[in-house]
From Swiss-Prot:
The modification Phosphoserine is found at S640, S650, S749, S762, S964, S975, S988, S1009, S1041. Transmembrane segments: none annotated. Changing S643R: No effect on S-640 phosphorylation, but strongly increases S-640 phosphorylation. This is Retinoblastoma-like protein 1. Residues 385-584 are annotated as: Domain A. Belongs to the retinoblastoma protein (RB) family. It comes from Homo sapiens.
Length: 1068
């Protein structure tokens, strides 16, 4: 897209642009100020970039930005944004379709580095376009179901002005109904704020027009005689319309994926009063809207009102769908008649394909599957429209909470009452505060979006409260069973847990209704830190079985957003947690479970298949065994490998509010304190308390296998393992561990010990130490646990999945992948400030580039970015707008350390990512592209470490730290696996000892191979495979063969091919 051009040609382009802009401004009747600003912006961008394509298309982008910046004084309101030039007019004059506009506008915003507010405006505009497009595609078939086909009508004959009015045609009715809908939606934005409400508003408009067609004399010819909503006696000769207008809302909801309760609510409480208001204002007239004397006036009045709305408030004229040039102007194919020429059909097919491509890239209504979320998903559901998906999401949500109330159930109340301190009052108080804050912000109009009606806010809140109590009960029942009746006060008294859970339930409800209030809106209005919120996401997914695939993908993408960027903001609670832990960032080896690493230096093959489930048919969200022989009740299974108590662990109940998510001090530090301060220790008799039946009361801390290094008077050190409970008084009660029969040891009475008495420990006690070491090795836990460790465990997992995907696409060796991983871990552990206000992918891409450069296995920046863009989370803003400097001297401090050999240069993309240095927002910060960040900041911090892995420099190689272990991805659970929730069909791997088919076998590709290949295969089968005389390579054989050696040497290529096959299957 971006190429260098000679200066002379550039000057000619600018001159031509000036002429084209002048022509555009004259056609639009634009003011000189906006025109001059648009030309200046275009010239500035043209000086840094070579703009590909039509000049007028880029001018349209520049012109739109200039128009939105202009301020016009008004009589009543003071000022008005914009200059009364709609986007539709600009695009029509520039002959630019909306889809092309959104594509070019994103590039224009990146090149001109427009502020975030403007980007959000374009995103809202694009979403409005998508909602309108989706609804229009539903509008046509519904209209054809109710009324006659407007495209089969004979064309109107030309008539003079003096001729009498003629009745409205079906096409006129089609246009009027849509215009009435978009006008109502635009002026009644509290209803049209999401896809579900907008769709039900459309059904109300259709219901109104149907009622007028039935009630109006001699207008029943407009109706489709086969419509199921017609009165039972409609086809009789003596049919007469009733005095009360008929209502077909229920029929439309049944036939076209509507929600009856929602649609009736909008009709009765909002739509009918608004139509009455239009009659009062004389915008609508007559006893019947379709009457011969009033239809033309009504149509003109509604169109006039809507035009005023577009000029003053709106941006996007949604009547563009009705135009004859809709295909060219917006990309939405019109309903074609049966005699449409073949060429026209081809053009419409191309437009529809472009529209589909646009939606697939945007993925607003069907979120893409995050790389880390695929293990939670169920099987794919049948392909449905976005409207059906949205209404079904609401229906599914309502079915989840059916029969429940927004209050704790009897079972949950019993759990509350079993606590030492009943938390019900505090929970009610928290939920009340959240409800008030939510309703206030949901109904409040802002620059980002209009406020909704209080009834919608209350309805959403009630659904979320019911879901909250349902999930809370499931979590508490599971935790009670897992912990054998342990007191739940410590968890239930943590405000952050309840606030996070309620916020997650509200997000689920908002997503189900396709609300434009997208994440992180909910945590922003509730003032909830992302670093705390992410913990509850996996708990919700695992505990609520009724969540749809799209909902699970949405929640998982939220978790990824937090882990990759939101939790790393400068004001994040993460930095406080790091400060509490003495700024010791845990390594991957310290937080990942020991059995979750790849074995060997190169990694095992199994761990090299991140996205390859045992079967692409189903990704089970929760591990379930559905066989008769091994079925387990769901309510008896643990919610998560990491318990809720562990996620929300706090040292004591008393300090929970102050240190809710502070990193628990390591047990070694606690024991150091015990030794230096001479803490009193008590050993409890085995008859009174054991490690198995101990229960932790509020104010106590469990010490599990803690060790205390004690230096004796002779200078020798001994390690004494402890297993006990610490209380607020500073005393620790030691709990005896169960011993083998030959090592039986009994304590007759509690012995009071101090640290001084422990100094003289005898080496004769080594048997006890060995026994406890054996006991501790059976505990398969990470070296570091707690809130901070959980966060970094998920961060490392997310980064490893993305890096693995990149390496597979770029055919990177396992050795280089581990070096990249080691470098990435180094930046997180030793340079955590590099992540502040930045994105995880930025460090990952830089680590990839520098290690490939050092090891001479170079991949160009263009190759890396091409593979990165194919990842579902990829966004151009990640590599085009990177924080360079928020604190003075940060860049300068490391400029001197840069070596030209490591400078990131890519001719194809260097210009593409060139961003003007400017400040965005009140915080002083300089932003640039990823290349500039790499060259000015990253290399200076990482170069000395990366050079240690330079194979050409043996001196550096001697200092190279060992490569960090790389996490492997757990494969999907074993067979048999259910492939459908509707049918009892299971699959298992084929247990066959025979060998694989040699690669030299015949291959036939459907729609690609000649028929001769198929004939050869058939002949071979008829002959009993006589021609397969070659040696078969057994998959389970241990014998080494040349074929096997070749396969192992090229395992990355083979794995990539397998990966492509799985991806293709998953996408179909």
């Amino acid at each position: 897209m971006f190429e260098d051009k000679p200066h002379a040609e550039g000057a000619a382009v600018v001159a031509a642009a000036g002429e084209a802009l002048q022509a555009l401004c004259q056609e639009l009747n634009l003011d000189e100020g906006s025109a001059a600003e648009a030309l200046d912006d275009f010239t500035a961008i043209r000086g840094n970039y070579s703009l590909e394509g039509e000049v007028t298309h880029w001018l349209a982008c520049s012109l739109y930005v200039a128009c939105r910046k202009s301020i016009i004084p008004t009589v009543g309101k003071g000022i008005m944004e914009g200059n009364c030039v709609s986007l539709t007019r600009i695009l029509r004059s520039a002959k630019l379709s909306l889809i092309q506009f959104f594509s070019k506008m994103k590039k224009w915003m990146d090149m001109s580095n427009l502020p975030q507010e403007f980007r959000e405006r374009i995103e809202r505009l694009e979403r409005n376009f998508e909602v309108s497009t989706v609804i229009f595609k539903k509008y046509e078939p519904i209209f054809l179901d109710i009324f006659q086909n407007p495209y089969e009508e004979p064309p109107k004959l030309p008539r003079s002005r003096k001729q009498r009015r003629i009745p409205c045609s079906v096409k006129d009715l089609f246009n009027f109904c849509w215009t009435l809908f978009v006008y109502t939606k635009g002026n009644f934005r509290m209803i049209g704020d999401d896809l579900v409400n907008s769709y039900h508003l459309l059904l109300c408009c259709l219901d109104l027009i149907f009622a007028n067609a039935i009630m109006c004399p001699n207008r029943q010819d407009l109706l489709n005689p086969s419509f199921k909503g017609l009165p039972s006696d409609f086809h009789t000769a003596d049919f007469t319309a009733s005095e009360e207008p008929p209502c077909i809302i229920a029929v439309l909801c049944e036939l076209h994926d509507g929600l009856l309760v929602e649609a009736k609510g909008i009709k009765e409480h909002y739509f009918k009063p608004y139509i009455s208001k239009l009659f009062d204002r004389k915008i609508l007239k007559g006893e019947c809207l379709l009457d011969l004397s009033s239809f033309t006036d009504n149509s003109k009045a509604v169109n006039k009102e809507y035009e005023e709305y577009v000029l003053t408030v709106g941006d996007f004229d949604e009547r563009i769908f009705l135009g004859a040039d809709a295909e060219e102007e917006i990309g939405t194919p019109r309903k074609f008649t049966r005699d449409t020429p073949l060429g026209k059909l081809t053009a419409q097919a191309n437009v529809e394909y472009n529209l589909q491509q646009h939606f697939e890239k945007k993925r607003s209504f069907a979120p893409s599957t995050p790389l880390t979320g695929r293990r939670y998903l169920r099987e794919k559901e049948a392909v449905i429209t976005p409207v059906a998906s949205a209404t079904q999401s609401v229906s599914r949500l309502q079915s989840i909470v059916a029969g429940l109330k927004n209050a704790p159930s009897d079972q949950l109340i019993n759990i509350f009452e079993s606590c030492v301190r009943n938390p019900v009052e505090n929970i009610m108080k928290i939920l009340k505060g959240i409800g008030e804050t939510f309703c206030q912000h949901y109904t409040q109009s802002t620059d980002e979006q209009p406020g909704s009606h209080i009834d919608f806010a209350v309805n959403r809140l009630k659904l979320a409260e019911i879901l909250y109590y349902k999930i809370l009960e499931t979590v508490m029942v599971q935790e009670t069973r897992r912990l054998h009746g342990m007191d739940m006060s410590v968890l239930l008294e943590q405000d952050i847990f309840h606030r996070s859970l309620m916020a997650c339930c509200l997000e689920i409800v908002l997503f189900a209704y396709s609300s434009p209030r997208t994440f992180p809106w909910i945590i922003e209005v509730l003032n909830l830190q992302p670093f705390y919120f992410y913990k509850v996401i996996e708990v919700v997914i695992r505990s609520e079985e009724g969540l749809s695939r799209d909902m699970v993908k949405h929640l998982n993408s939220i978790e990824e957003q937090i882990l990759e960027s939101l939790a790393w903001s400068h004001d994040s609670a993460l930095w406080e947690a790091l400060q509490v832990s003495a700024n010791k960032v845990p390594t991957c080896e310290e937080v990942i479970f020991p059995n979750n690493f790849e074995t060997g230096n190169g990694g095992n093959v199994q761990g090299h298949l991140p996205l390859m489930p045992m079967s692409p048919l189903m990704h089970p969200r929760v591990k379930e065994v559905r066989t008769d022989s091994g079925s387990l009740r769901r309510d008896m299974q643990p919610l998560s490998p990491i318990s809720v108590h562990e996620r929300y662990s706090s040292p004591t109940a008393g300090s929970a509010k102050r240190r809710l998510f502070g990193e628990d001090p390591p047990k070694e530090m606690l024991m150091d304190k015990i030794i230096t301060e001479g803490t009193k220790l008590k050993i409890a008799p085995s008859s009174s308390i054991t490690a198995e039946n101990v229960s932790i009361l509020p104010g106590q801390t469990l010490l599990t296998m803690a060790t205390a290094p004690v230096t004796g008077t002779t200078g020798h050190k001994v390690t004494i393992p402890l297993h006990g409970v610490a209380n607020d008084a500073g005393e620790i009660t030691l709990i005896p561990l169960s011993m083998n029969t030959n090592q039986e040891s009994k304590v007759k009475s509690p012995v009071s010990l101090t640290a001084h008495s422990l100094i003289g420990a005898s080496p004769k006690q080594t048997n006890l130490t060995k026994a406890q070491e054996v006991h501790s090795t059976g505990i398969n836990r990470p070296k570091r646990t707690g809130s901070l460790a959980l966060f970094y465990r998920k961060v490392y997992h997310l980064a490893s999945v993305r890096l693995r995907d990149l390496c597979l696409k770029l055919d990177v060796s396992n050795e280089l992948r581990r070096k990249i991983w080691t470098c990435f871990e180094f930046t997180l552990v030793h340079c955590p400030d590099l992540m502040k206000d930045r994105h995880l992918d930025q460090l990952l891409l830089c680590a990839f580039y520098i290690m490939a450069k050092v090891t001479k296995e170079e991949r160009t920046f263009q190759e890396i970015m091409k593979s990165y863009r194919n990842q579902p989370q990829a966004n151009s803003h990640v590599y085009r707008s990177v924080l360079l400097k928020s604190i003075p001297r940060e860049v300068v401090a490391y400029n001197k350390n840069i070596n030209d050999d490591f400078e990131m240069i890519d001719c194809d993309l260097e210009d593409a990512t060139k961003t003007p240095d400017c400040s965005s927002g009140p915080v002083k910060e300089e932003r640039g592209d990823l290349i500039k960040f790499y060259n000015t900041i990253y290399v200076g911090r990482v170069k000395s470490f990366a050079l240690k892995y330079d194979l050409a420099n043996q001196d550096h190689m001697m200092d190279a730290p060992p490569l960090s272990p790389f996490p492997h991805i757990k494969q999907q659970p074993g067979s048999p696996r259910r492939i459908s929730q509707q049918h009892s069909i299971y699959i298992s791997p084929h247990k066959n000892g025979s060998g694989l088919t040699p690669r030299s076998a015949l291959l036939y590709k459907f729609n690609g191979s000649p028929s001769k290949s198929l004939k050869d295969i058939n002949n071979m089968i008829r002959q009993g495979e006589q021609r397969t005389k070659k040696r078969v390579i057994a998959i389970d054989s241990d014998a080494e063969s040349p074929a096997k050696r070749v396969c192992q040497e090229n395992d990355d290529v083979l794995l990539k091919r397998l990966q492509d096959v799985v991806s293709e299957r998953a996408n179909h």
